[in-house]
Amino acid sequence: MATQNVDSGHEDMVHDAQFDYYGKFLATCSSDKMIKIFDVGGENPQHLVDLRGHEGPVWQVAWAHPKFGKILASASYDRKVIVWKEVGNNSWSIIHQYAGHELSVNSISWAPHEFGLSLACASSDGSVTIHNYNNNVWEAPQKIQVSQIGVNSVSWSPAAIPTSLVNSANTIIPAPIKRIVTGSCDNLIKIFKNVEDKWILDKQLEDHKDWVRDVAWAPNIGLPYSKIASCSQDRSVIVWTQDENGVWSGKPLPKFDDIVWRVSWSVIGNILAVSCGDNQVTLWKEGVDSEWKLISHVENN
């Protein structure tokens, strides 16, 4: 695949860039308070529109599944979460806005589309809010108190049930349970599950020695386990695996040379991308011996 360079046109640091579901559109956000959308489906990227609505640096953007239309969420230092929707050709409107967090909103994550249009938002105030759209109305958000200090990242579990690929044809597969994982400034990873429309703490994972900067739940194609990647200010990445008995165990990757800011899984969950503060991105894959091995290395200039 040929590499494309996109001149974002932002006037300050770019904090996030996300492709839509089909890889045709790219959204970027910046400390200049702006969100920009580009058409990258052709040979030359084309800037389409600027979205203005935030009053501070915009940390993250996230595309919803296309079954709901062309919808983009954004999170900002201004304590606001905004959900945008394209209502005409390059014409976007705000369809939901929430300013109830007391401090910066650091991370946002859309639920798998099987769970409906649902957005999780993690904040420096120590909470995560869940925003659900039902019956043409945005419901009052559900609030989860995660930590006494800030939450840096949130990620949804996939809707696929572990072991569904290997179960026999006569096995009754239970409905998936809504779960999220968070990473916070108390060095902890916490997993919450939704039981009778209430979010309860399911598991706490404790191996990091400094702030957890990012968490990412791996896609699941029906194999008999779940995986979560976490990264930290302590320069470590840990891949957590939940076995068939529900027990979580962590496997650390080799120590990195700088703070690890982001982790991201490939579409089928077999390759992990790791982004560090020294501008290096590395790709890792689990071997047959269950050890994670470096398969590619990219240094950004």
Swiss-Prot record:
It is a peripheral membrane protein. GO terms for cellular component: COPII vesicle coat; endoplasmic reticulum membrane; lysosomal membrane; nuclear pore; nuclear pore outer ring. GO terms for biological process: COPII-coated vesicle budding; endoplasmic reticulum to Golgi vesicle-mediated transport; mRNA transport; positive regulation of TOR signaling; protein exit from endoplasmic reticulum; protein import into nucleus. WD repeats lie at residues 9-48, 53-94, 100-141, 146-202, 207-250, 255-294. Gene3D superfamilies: YVTN repeat-like/Quinoprotein amine dehydrogenase (2.130.10.10). Keywords: Cytoplasmic vesicle, Endoplasmic reticulum, ER-Golgi transport, Lysosome, Membrane, mRNA transport, Nuclear pore complex, Nucleus, Protein transport, Repeat, Translocation, Transport, WD repeat. SMART domains: WD40. It holds the Pfam family WD40. GO terms for molecular function: structural molecule activity. The keyword Membrane applies. It comes from the Eukaryota. It is found in: Cytoplasmic vesicle, COPII-coated vesicle membrane; Endoplasmic reticulum membrane; Nucleus, Nuclear pore complex; Lysosome membrane. Present with 21400 molecules/cell in log phase SD medium. Belongs to the WD repeat SEC13 family. Component of the coat protein complex II (COPII) which promotes the formation of transport vesicles from the endoplasmic reticulum (ER). The coat has two main functions, the physical deformation of the endoplasmic reticulum membrane into vesicles and the selection of cargo molecules. It also functions as a component of the nuclear pore complex (NPC). NPC components, collectively referred to as nucleoporins (NUPs), can play the role of both NPC structural components and of docking or interaction partners for transiently associated nuclear transport factors. PANTHER family: NUCLEAR PORE COMPLEX PROTEIN SEC13 / SEH1 FAMILY MEMBER, PROTEIN SEC13 HOMOLOG. Component of the COPII coat composed of at least 5 proteins: the sec23/24 complex, the sec13/31 complex, and the protein sar1A or sar1B. Component of the nuclear pore complex (NPC) which constitutes the exclusive means of nucleocytoplasmic transport. Probably part of the GATOR complex. This is Protein SEC13 homolog. It comes from Dictyostelium discoideum (Social amoeba). The gene is sec13.
